[in-house]
Amino acid sequence: MNIEFSNIEARVIGCLMEKELTTPDLYPLTLNSLTNACNQKSNRDPVMLLSEAEVLDAVDALIEKRLINDESGFHGRVTKYRHRFCNTEFGNFQFTGQEKGIICCMLLRGAQTPGELRTRSHRLCQFIDVKEVENVLDKLVQDSLVVKLPREAGKRDSRYMHQFSGEVDLAEVPLTVAPVSEVVQGDDRIEQLEKDLSALKNEVSELRYLIEQRL
């Protein structure tokens, strides 16, 4: 795979993919809207505080790589940007809706478990259950687009990470052994409440974004 995003480039592509799916009436995005999306506090890990200049530098680099289109010529005075990373006529990748949702979520939040991906991608795509997420992840792993990370000490599930920022060297993934007293058994009820809270926060953030763009 010839693609290797910087952290900011991954965030930019992830944001364009997300807004394409969640707010299609506001897509493609202006530089200001894209910067706001990159700096969102919800559904982002890590939270960034990028300037428009930093975002524009990443956009210019992605235009050079032919992964973003500058659509200023078609939308009047304001320059707007559209990704061509996947599912375009000349794109290298053609993903299913579920694959696209998972990749987008990983570009925005990094390594995650199948359960986290199911919860956090609910506005991007739909999964019946975690098993369906795992099946899609297995396909992406087979295509060398995603890698399964070693399970962390005290954790029930392994995380998965995209490889669009370079191949993940599993030998360099830190493994820590937690003391027995610190190993907490997963509580399904608490875990579900946490997932529901995360989903609500994402919806509030999207509503706030929509309101800001319409003012």
UniProtKB/Swiss-Prot annotation:
Coiled coil: none annotated. Pfam families: DUF480. InterPro entries: DUF480, WH-like_DNA-bd_sf, WH_DNA-bd_sf. Belongs to the UPF0502 family. This is UPF0502 protein Ping_1905.
